[in-house]
Amino acid sequence: MTDETTEILVAGANPYPVVIGRGLRFDLARHLGSAVSKVLVVHPPTLGAAAAELRESLAGQYEVLLTEVPDAEAAKRIEVASFLWCIMGQADFTRSDAVVGLGGGAVTDLAGFAAATWLRGVRLVQAPTTLLGMVDAAVGGKTGINTAEGKNLVGAFYAPAAVVCDLDMLISLGRNELLAGFAEVVKYGFIAEPEILDIIERDVDAATDPESAEFRRVVELSIGIKARVVGEDFTEQGLREILNYGHTLGHAIEHAERYQWRHGAAIAVGMVFAAELGRLSGRLSDDAVERHRRILASLTLPTSYPLGRWQTLLAAMQRDKKARGSLLRFIVLDDVARPTVLAGPDQSLLFAAYQEIAS
């Protein structure tokens, strides 16, 4: 275990650092800056004590307001966003104030959306406390909430001032929550960095130990890939689309299951579906498809979905924000680290891929 701090820059029109290390949640003032007066810390119920510690560390410099929101996807509702707007309005929040998202991906999505929309944008610092938040949700500048029609349909691209990843927060994270976050880590391995897959295959226990060098390595590799892609294509006009590997079906599963499935579990199944889609379209080898199943299963992530739900999933995918007009778009692989877009595949091909993952 190292105490060194790593800083990865997300380039672009509004560049920002992603800082990785230990004990960093007590160093947020450096990223909030001296011009800020009030700080709204948005956190879930499970992080009340951590939020109070954060308030104590900031109290000498800022007026700190702690606001508890529901856990997980229940936070990403218009009613909760409206609640945050009311809090900021009652506190006379101005453009010289700031929002901190302290929590998992759903909380940072919500906090980012509130910051992006209040007065058309106030300063935002993200402090993700889950693996999913660190390697994915908090890093890319996507913010948003869900609607009855689907996931993340209302939101904004909004760059934070910084993303602060305190690895110490992962030590006490529940095992299932940690492993669910590994779905996104595995995604990076398949679309861009085979070293991630090699580390997991070599020693899955070390790779998933938050205090190990192997764990830190896969986290830094994952964030580095996300930062590079987002820096080149912040608003998802081209390259960034590769980050959606496994997400078209994955988001449909989340919607079909009323968000009772963990995001990582849904994305794991979505990646196996995308791999089968690649194989059935003549792009990906049988061995590469089975490698998906083997690695995900080693992380106790699901690789199949119940039979008989296809029409529900198809309807959800057709409402997906990644679709272009009436055409569904899937990221598939020609090989490991060779992603490409499969646009408008025939529904018979999609159903055949679904049958391969149906249990």
Swiss-Prot record:
How is the cofactor bound, in the record's words? Binds 1 divalent metal cation per subunit. Can use either Co(2+) or Zn(2+).
For this UniProt record, the keywords arranged alphabetically read as follows: Amino-acid biosynthesis, Aromatic amino acid biosynthesis, Cobalt, Cytoplasm, Lyase, Metal-binding, NAD, Nucleotide-binding, Zinc
Gene Ontology cellular-component terms for this entry are:
cytoplasm
Record-linked Pfam families: DHQ_synthase, DHQS_C
Q: Name one GO molecular function term.
A: metal ion binding
Q: Which reaction does it catalyse?
A: 7-phospho-2-dehydro-3-deoxy-D-arabino-heptonate = 3-dehydroquinate + phosphate
Query: Which pathway is it part of?
Result: Metabolic intermediate biosynthesis; chorismate biosynthesis; chorismate from D-erythrose 4-phosphate and phosphoenolpyruvate: step 2/7
Which cofactor names does the annotation list?
NAD(+); Co(2+); Zn(2+)
Superkingdom in the source lineage: Bacteria
Family listed: Belongs to the sugar phosphate cyclases superfamily. Dehydroquinate synthase family.
| Protein name as annotated | 3-dehydroquinate synthase
Specify the species: Leifsonia xyli subsp. xyli (strain CTCB07)
Q: Which gene encodes it?
A: aroB
